[in-house]
Amino acid sequence: MSAPLQVTVIAKSGGPLTKRISLATDGSLRSDGSACVMSRGTAKRFTFSRLEQFADLIEHFAPHQAICLGGLRSDLPDEVSVTTRQKLNGAREAGVIARTSEYLIFPPGKPALALVDHDTKGMPPSVAERIENLGGLLPALLSVLPALAGVARVVRCSTSAGLFRTDTGHSIAGSDGVHAYLIVKNGADGDRFLKTLHARCWLAGLGWLMVGAGGQLLERSIIDRVVGSPERLVFEGRPLLDPPLAQDQDSRRPLAIEGEALDTVAACPPLTPLEKAKLRELHAKEVMRLAPEAAKEKGAFIDWQASELAQRTGMDLRRAHRTIKRQCEGVLLPDVVLQFDDDDLAGTTVADVLADPARFEGATLADPLAGTEYGRCKARIMRRGDGTVWINSFAHGRTVYELKSDFRTAKTELEKAANDEAPETFVRLALTGDLGEDEVEELRNIAHRRTGINKRTLDNKLKSARQRAASEEARQVAERRTAERQDPRPQLPVPLSDAEWLPTMQAVNDVLGRNCATEPPTRNVDHCVALVRARRVPSLHFLTRKADDDTGS
């Protein structure tokens, strides 16, 4: 290693930051990760120049400690207090931060650690067989990322490795997961790198879909693609074990392997259009293969959850079925309970969040479908520029949930609105609610009766609002795609149709002119990029030579 690297050591106040593992009645392992959430504690800068120092750090972690691979911002002290984003509430208190990417960062162009997290959950036999045929996990990864062979890294087995029973001395098979911390040249490219590596694993036959609790299809591969953010907690503390379980600590001893820093862009470039097409084909085949199982799981989940919801709220079973069905489709209606990480928010519903979005913005919670069984702190409440509320979840990848009113809550709100506010309230509810056209029409009729405004006028008002919303959504989507762009290659803006094209084309020509590839871009005799024109040919007869035509050849 040359340049020193930095990570952040997180210490939780008042409890563990690791899993509790116990034995179930049938002798299998029961793992409880509900404590793996942090609302208060400290963050400490840790700088190291040798991988052995990092390995020693994580080997001796206590159960209340974890790491973030991003470093504290350079203007922050070496040790700070950590609180939640809600309690910080935008304040700039000295020595106090929230565990967000505002405070924990990967400086662009600077080396850092990137986590390759291997887990076999849901792995089908075909993928397991392929890994075995390739010679194991490392050869499988090398088949996708050959440059990994010479990369400096620290490798450690999962939290549940090396378990045994003290009463019998028998070993117990735990998780065969692995954490591999790679030194990369540009930590800021880590998120793109992991997502691309995940896609390339799919192309190599090392990816799969699994059916979730709600019948949703979850995308997996031999590496976790969503651990690339600088503020994400990585749990390395020893687990809490209930008797008679114990752990052989040597089985988890980190192994430091010296080598070079990985150039993630050169070693794992963005997918080509052909590769993207192949990836879509593989996904489609997996979706078709699992469709019957997914439908069965979804139906069972809806029946069970609808029964629970009807019993809790007293609503009729038909409405409860619709609520849970929409939840499976990514739309959360008012009666759905959200499982926030903050115990003070226990029992909070979607209706509570919609009534006071500012209070909940930024709050973390469990995935609305996977629940706390999958883990806490997997999702976050977000707000768009127009005020609409949504949930960004990173459980099993990335999932978006929309929080919306249903007809009953929309009708109640409209009837409570003042007469002069009814038209605007109607438009807002029609735009943001989960409503059918018949329900929108009924809301319009209520607004008409209360205000006396012509129905056609209300329809036109809603139509104009929908057009403005569609235009704004298109603009935001374009901006978001630009901001989230994973391709690290530079881009040039396309000139407008009536603008000057020569400066842009000259820039493209200069770049391509320096291409030294075996098969460089096609160029003409003047060494400029060749211009290719497509022409519609009415008949292949026109492509033959006249002499050939005359001879009948």
Can you describe what each PLM-predicted range is?
Residues 1-99, 103, 123-128, 132-135, ...:
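N-terminal nucleic-acid engagement/recognition segments and initiation subdomains in replication
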Residues 47, 53, 62, 201-297:
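Catalytic "initiation/cleavage/transfer" segments centered on a nucleophilic residue
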Residues 98-106, 141-173, 220-225, 378-380:
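Catalytic micro-motifs at enzyme active sites that drive phosphoryl/nucleotidyl and oxygen chemistry
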Residues 109-111, 175-177, 229-231:
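Short, solvent-exposed loop/turn segments at the edges of secondary structure
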Residues 111-119:
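Active-site-flanking beta-strand signature of metal-NTP-handling nucleotidyl enzymes
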Residues 116, 150-193, 233-236, 390-392, ...:
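Histidine-centered divalent-metal-coordination microenvironment in nucleic-acid enzymes
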